[in-house]
Amino acid sequence: MCTGERASFLFRIHIAKNENPGTLTEVGMRASYPLAAPREDGCEHCTSIPNSYSFVAAEERALNKVYGNVAVVHFDAHLDTWHPAKYPSAWVDPNNPNEQSFFTHGTMFWVAHNESLILEHKSVHAGLRTRLSGIEDNEDDTAQGWVRIACDDIDDLGAAGVAKQILDHVGTETPVYLSIDIDTIDAGLAPGTGTPEPGGWTTRELIRVLRGIEGLNVVGADIVEVAPAYDGVGETTALAAAQVGFEVLTSMVKRGMGEGGKGGKKVRDEL
């Protein structure tokens, strides 16, 4: 599992876009513990907590060297598959795909799809409740091979039903990149994010869904869009993100250990 830190390139998106994949690959090839042999073929498992979704395509490029195309299970209030000329169209030159404005927190899955990093017809959005610029948004999303589960669906299906839909669609052997935007959680519970949307899931509901999809073959994950400047004095957003990260990591370890995960030494989770 990748361990390390990466410097940010504020306002130099084109640099981050080109350099981050190499850094993640290099970090992922390191030995995961002192006696382990370093990997030679790339990043086997990659988990990050970046502040922005601009990091996601880099992780998918790094994982692509080991797994090829991966399915994406994307928890978010928003699609994030917009064509750059549509989101936001005001300052994008549609004739120049090398513009750094093509690479935003709402276009990164469009970028990843165009680079053939995402396994089509195996990828899922969950928790959606975004406003659309038009019906074309969903049509473009469908054309990229995504299935959508709306935030409201949890009222009818329950957390277990949402998890079952994801598992049934993706399967348990397909390599999966799990991407979690903190704005999946309702803005009243996790206000510290850049694009909050009311009417989201509770933290408990998201955690129940994540536990329900433990059977997925998760090879990479992120928890993104936490903005401490907008968090409350109780830091509820940061706490929620930390718990979500804990759930993801423990689920990955649990699957990796299999039966070996039983009977381990108990540890305290509080001082």
Predicted regions: what they are:
Residues M1-L271:
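Conserved alpha-helical scaffold segments that buttress catalytic/binding sites
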